[in-house]
Regions:
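Conserved small/polar residues in nucleotide/adenosyl-binding loops
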Residues: 1-4
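C-terminal functional extensions of proteins
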Residues: 74-121
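Short glycine/serine/threonine-rich phosphate/pyrophosphate-binding segments
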Residues: 49-56
Length: 121
């Protein structure tokens, strides 16, 4: 899905298929379609918007608003391991191991593809 028009981003990702390049005026609508229409999610290193979208989907899975198997590949191990210390979240009791079952952190395109295709079978 196309990013929201932001003043500091001048163009869409050139790798998005034209048929999948949508414009959204409102963030909430983009996130709804993002969660509703996607079968899997690949998250690349990013800023607050990327984190917002990731945590939105994780919250929907945790609260069972998304009940289907929804694999999430988090690409870029160093970036995400520095950013998210899930062990601390587990220690505080705010997430469980089950909450992390949908996450797959990797640097390998091959492993990411394998993970998604196995989960969606």
């Amino acid at each position: 899905y196309k990013r929201q028009d932001l003043p500091f981003e001048k163009s869409s990702n050139p790798y998005i298929s034209k048929g999948l390049n949508f414009n959204f005026k409102y963030f909430f609508l983009r996130k709804f379609m993002f969660a509703y229409r996607s079968e899997a999610l690949i998250i690349m290193p990013g800023g607050f918007g990327t984190l917002d979208e990731l945590f939105e989907v994780l919250t929907l899975i945790q609260t069972q608003k998304i009940k289907r198997d929804f694999p999430i590949v988090i690409f870029g191990e160093h970036f995400w391991n520095e950013l998210m210390n899930t062990d601390v979240l587990k220690e505080y009791g705010v997430i469980s191991d089950n909450d992390l079952d949908h996450l797959f952190v990797t640097d390998s395109v091959t492993d990411a593809f394998k993970h998604i295709t196995e989960r969606l079978q």
